[in-house]
Amino acid sequence: MSRCVITLNAGSSSIKFALFREGLTQEGSAKELTPMAIGLAEMVGEERRITVHDGAGAKIYEVKRTEHVDAPFHAEALRRILAWRQSAFPDAEVVAAGHRVVHGGVHYSAPVIVTDEVLKYLHTLIPLAPLHEPYNIAGILGAREAWPHVEQVACFDTAFHRTHPFVNDVFALPRRFYDEGVRRYGFHGLSYEYIVRRLREIAPLHAAGRVVVAHLGNGASMCAIRDGLSVASSMGFTALDGLPMGTRCGQLDPGVVLYLMQEKKMSAAEITDLLYRESGLKGLSGLSHDMRELEAADTLEAQQAIEYFVFRIRRELGGLAAVLKGIDAIVFCGGIGENSRHVRERVLEGMEWIGVELDRSANSANAEVISSERSRTRVFVIPTDEEGMIARHTLALLDQMAAA
């Protein structure tokens, strides 16, 4: 019987999940993972719903509940996901659940089996990723309760960036803070890792070269990659740094925080809420965190929010190209990167100095390659697959344990 793995990406009021089956390629020479189902459990107001699509994108299951439920969202949702899986795929041998965990701190540079000791350490990282880590942990606890006999594997967004040289990890603070773990971690590592894997399949020469990847979504960051390894990232100690995001401010003069504390008398909790939940595109536009709504809006504030978003991407692109001492390829991924032709066009405008010439018709069609044939630097649009990477890591870790 083929092994199956469930992947979970838990947020505050949602759980993205997927069921993968391991099999052999048509040639029978290598193992491959096939997505059997991809779903979303979410809570909107008092309504709790689960929607599932098959690997081809067709909806195969949907259920909604509006009555009051006393059970915590994550625990109740995972029990319902388990019940659906047992009904829809009764013969699937689920050997593990793989979890996206945003922050792994200094201790974890590779996936690990979740133990009580691991969970204890992850709790200490909540202040570094308050929008994600508490809910990642809640997802793990809910999965443990729902599936007590299934291995739980934590896969970290920070792990891919542990190849950074010291100079790209350190802050100009007294050295003791670095030794205590105050350093640049970088995030979206599972996404970047998948992009490297996919690039090796479709453009191996570029994958072995100097690549800048822009993961642009509600969370946004950029990464410089050389020979498939992370060299530098726009994010730092927390997932707040770097590019402006849907509701997060991105790069900010630390003096602004001191001003808010000293002059505005704002508490740490108030500043946290401001920087994580009320800033970014939402704060600048006064309208929405959603790029689609901003592109459709005709207000000056919405256009200025987009302009600032593009400006920061262009500035980061130039800096990362300098870190790499040149650039062979650019990759756009994430919800905005994959779908907003306007953002991509504005980011690449005037980038001939790094060898980019845009094919406007290909860009408008969201083609896989959007640079012209004359472009020295190749530009790709590649849908990312964090769930697939989690599944691969999870099964690989089980294989390592079995071989030990």
Curated annotation (Swiss-Prot):
Record EC number: 2.7.2.1
Residues engaged in binding ATP: K16, H215, L216, G217, N218, G219, D290, M291, R292, G335, I336, G337, E338, N339
Cofactor: Mg(2+); Mn(2+)
Gene Ontology MF: a single term: ATP binding
InterPro entries with a match to the protein in the record: Ac/propionate_kinase, Aliphatic_acid_kin_short-chain, Aliphatic_acid_kinase_CS, ATPase_NBD
Residue numbers binding substrate: R100
A Gene Ontology biological process term: acetyl-CoA biosynthetic process
Subcellular location: Cytoplasm
Catalysed reaction, written as an equation: acetate + ATP = acetyl phosphate + ADP
Annotated keywords: ATP-binding, Cytoplasm, Kinase, Magnesium, Metal-binding, Nucleotide-binding, Transferase
The record's free-text note on cofactor binding: Mg(2+). Can also accept Mn(2+).
Keyword Aminoacyl-tRNA synthetase attached: no
Organism superkingdom: Bacteria
Alphabetical list of NCBIfam families matching this protein: ackA (TIGR00016)
Family that this chain belongs to: Belongs to the acetokinase family.
Subunit architecture: Homodimer.
Protein name as annotated: Acetate kinase
Taxonomic path: Bacteria, Pseudomonadati, Pseudomonadota, Alphaproteobacteria, Hyphomicrobiales
